[in-house]
Amino acid sequence: MIIFKNLLKLLIILLTIKLYFCIEIKREEHLTILNELNENSDVIQYSILPGNNEEYEIVKGIQEDAIVYGYYMSNVEVNGWAYLSLVSNDKYNDSTQSRAFGYLEGYLTKDLIWNSKVNYYKNAFNSSEIPNKLDDWLTENIESIHTFIVNNRKSRYWNQITLVMDQINGMLDGYNEANTNSSETLSLHDFFVLNMFGDLFDLMPALNLDKEYKYFQKDLNDIQDWFKRSQHCSALIKVSSDYSELYSGHTTWSGYYTMLRIFKSYNQQFSSDVSGTLSKRNIFSSYPGALISVDDFYLLGDTRMVVIETTNSLVTNDLYHLIRPTTVLSWMRVIVSNRMSTNGKEWCENFQRYNSGTYNNQWMIVSYNLFVPYNELKDGALYVLEQIPGYIEFSDQTQALRQGWWNSYNIPFYETIYDASGYNNYTANNYSDSTIYYMSYQTCPRAEIFRNFAGYVESLEDFQSLLRYNDFEYDPLSHKLPFYAIASRYDLSKKNPSPFGATDTKVTCNSMIDQNTIVAISGPTTSNGQPIFEWNSKIDFMESTSHLGCPEKYNFPWVSFSDTTFRNL
């Protein structure tokens, strides 16, 4: 009995020591994080606490009883990105967490949001206001969402949409609370528009606003001009030849005025039983005022999935009548799908619901749980979905990935989507050979460049290099045109140069997933000696393109981002 008591005491002592060291390790990790973030004096730490009369109290530092706490670095001159990491507290209900989440982000990022709004409205609408037709459509859409929510209170899907609305309304309130200038007050519709960057490329023509707003004009006789404004990105998913590593990466194409960037980490402790939230941790490249990536590129920490898209622009006007306000916009559906899915098939099934027919993309969902180094890829490792108004198609494309890689470059893969989107019309004799060549899934320039180089990728450095690739002067596959490249540079075109092209690259791989880490770089590519982009060196662009808050010069390093740190590499 005495021996037993002594053993019990010893066990208690050992457990106490273990607990002490666990607490100390956590404390040391936390202090390390704070020290790393505090190396830059621009880092802000705030907590949001419940106040009186349903208001919030925002305090400096990290508080244990905070609804949400976060780290924020606003200086984009450091490495081309602002940085925001927010964590909510599961002691509070989902709605309270979500609204406070949005509120703190809106409050902290107020200046970036205003600059981003000014740039987008001036460049897209040539105005400071939302077009009336679009404003009316948004009113109908938001009313429809509220009706669905009221009529589906027990639905986890609509509970998720409710949380999205809570978050965006919270962001609106936080922004306006931080704002001290009445002329810079924003509305809920403004925040919707900031999240609808991709949706608007289809919605504006559907509302017949493309003729009024040059930014959205689509001349089917000059399809490359339309692609220059609507095409969004190159992507590559690559398994190494010995199956030791699986890489996922994405290069955004966009107007250079969008290069006011922010990397975000959301840790939203919503319930799994009420809202169906299965992935609470999400790190992604983004823009001020957006709840989504827009690029899109997400690392979902809890489900070990990477979600990527590139845009498939419609080259027909025959489908726009299918776009209606009684659906759910793409930006909302991707949030819900990210939270409610544990694999690619589930993600696709969630995303296809309430198809808005806007932001018609090819989505790639990589399930790293189905990748084991040095073993054959399991079925379901890669799902690919494509959307057009009125129709969505998806399937398991793991077999294609087993051959080495999957590449994506703004041309539809599925034949039904390709034909319905109008691409098959450009094989007729009344179009030039170059146009037909550019519209082909198999022979367009990026398809050939990927085919030429992807097989040689065997390291993270190789992967990064390919996604920044532009050697248009010497690579015959580029035909001496700077936009026929993985990372385009339309500003270098001798004919009609414009401030458009590859604006970033983000990559991750299996060995980085468990650390919730993405490596990224901001700005136009300098691959193969391409010149560094500087606004001051482009006088025409300076005068015609609003780029408020953007760095003047883009010569930034690769940066490693996680949910707790960012470091220049």
From Swiss-Prot:
Keyword DNA repair: no
GO cellular component annotations of the record: extracellular region
Superkingdom of origin organism: Eukaryota
GO molecular function: phospholipase activity
GO biological process, one term: phospholipid catabolic process
Chain positions carrying an annotated carbohydrate: N93, N126, N181, N425, N430
EC number(s) stated in the UniProt entry for this protein: 3.1.1.-
Signal peptide: 1-22
Alphabetized InterPro entries for the sequence: PLipase_B-like
Gene3D superfamilies xref list: 3.60.60.30
Keywords: Glycoprotein, Hydrolase, Lipid degradation, Lipid metabolism, Secreted, Signal
Keyword Transcription attached: no
Localization terms from the record: Secreted
UniProt family annotation: Belongs to the phospholipase B-like family.
Function: Probable phospholipase.
Protein name as it appears in the record: Phospholipase B-like protein D
Protein species of origin: Dictyostelium discoideum (Social amoeba)
Gene: plbD
